[in-house]
Amino acid sequence: VEIMISLIQFFSSSVLLKQEKTEQEIPDKKTINKEYWKVAFPAAIEGVLLNLMLLADLIMVGMLGIEKAAAVGIVSQPKMILQMIVSAAGVAITAIVARRKGEGDEEGLNSCIKQSLLLLGLLYFLFVCLSFIFSKNIVSFAGANEDYIEYASIYFQYIALSVFFKALCVVLSSAQIGVGNTKIVLISGMIGNALNVLLNYLLIFGKYGFPEMGIQGAAIATVIGNAVIFVILLYSVTKGDYGINILKKGSYHFTKKVLAPLQEIGTNSFLEHIFERIGLFIFARMIASLGTVAMGTHHYCILLWDLYYYFGVGMSSASASFTGRKLGEKRKDLAILYMRAAQYSGLWISIFVGIIFYLLKNSIFSLMISDERVILLGSSVMMIISLLIIPQTQAQVTAGVLRGAGDNRFIAIYSLFISAILRPYLAYIFAFIWKLGLVGIWIAFFSDEFLKMLLAQYRIQKGIWLQKKI
């Protein structure tokens, strides 16, 4: 009982609320939940749909044969590395734009968008040029062999161009998330990704009079899809909605007010991504050494886990948006209440999804594959995933609050300790010393998310994020 009371007190925000007393009007719980999900739901669904599009992409490319599939797979690593910088910058852009929106500083808000577009546009233009010149060297360094290096080199050149448009999309979508306009992010993503899947089908296989281009067609489809998303998002920031109008407000001249927080928050986020990548790289090596069945089963488990993971990413983005805006409005009490709403709703949703995963664990794998060994092992892993997503959701929401406040250095620190060091160490113990195999790997994943949840909540309870200036 004492342990339960201690846990309730640890996760309670009552102490923080008492410290932030206000005479201003406070919305009721129903209003807060409604407003939160108005922002969170489109962001969450956009992440899930993106993951489904990537899955469709993978299936169509896989039909071309192992060499073409390997070429696409080997390019995914340099592609992720290219995207890490703008992904980190996106966290900073959301935090800055949300804070300026809350402060009512539309000039500063639009300056952030314009300067970020200029800076990252120039940077990624340079990346594209270098990628075209050194494409074969890059994919060779990534591990491509002679069987498919030519395919991989050509594919990477197109993907580098798609990453350029993706980078610009991240700048604009991060800004829209910052002001709470996730609906346009969902709409643009749905249109662009649907077009991507359609063009994949037409260009990969040469349907309805289109040329049969194989993986080159898949890459071209990705470029066009991202370009369309960029055009839609670019139009959205010229209309004046939510205070965003880059045609009439803001400046392209670089200023300390934009670059200082962009550098600070972005660097911390970049380090977080680096530490996560290190941990995942070590994990991949461990899983590969467990054998083909374990590797294949893990791949299917990741695909299923990602569907919910990206839903949590949407909740995290919404939490960052509300935190930044409410702190900008000098309403720390509301920042706490929106965080509480996200945590509570996230808890019940994760429990509900966890129960579904647990009850349907055998059926899900039976639909995807007929190998009994994979079904048995996958069902065991799904039991862990059904529990894992509960602390994972809390960790995502709470980390989103810290990012929205600009207090994300702590996240980078615990990502180094947990993801890059502790998680691989625990995975080695569980999988190899205790001989639990792939199940041990996923127990380490659970430990990772549970510790992140505790440490993020510890930082929240310290209240430092409420005082953070951007």
Spans of features found by a protein language model:
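N-terminal transmembrane alpha-helices
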Residues: D28-I59, M63-L64, Q77-A92, I96, ...
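Transmembrane helical elements of multi-pass membrane transporters/channels
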Residues: K38-D57, Y158, G192, G225-I229, ...
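Transmembrane alpha-helix boundary and packing residues in multipass membrane permease domains
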Residues: A43, G47, L58-I59, S76, ...
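Alpha-helical transmembrane segments and their lipid-water interface positions
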Residues: L50, L54-D57, V61, Q83-G90, ...
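Helix-terminus/linker motif at the lipid-water interface of multi-pass membrane proteins
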Residues: L52-A70, V139-E146, L202-M213, I274-L307, ...
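Small-residue-rich hydrophobic transmembrane alpha-helices
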Residues: L58, A69-C129, K166-V185, T297-L359, ...
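Short runs within selected transmembrane alpha-helices of multi-pass transporters and secretion channels
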Residues: G90, T94, I159-I177, V185-N193, ...
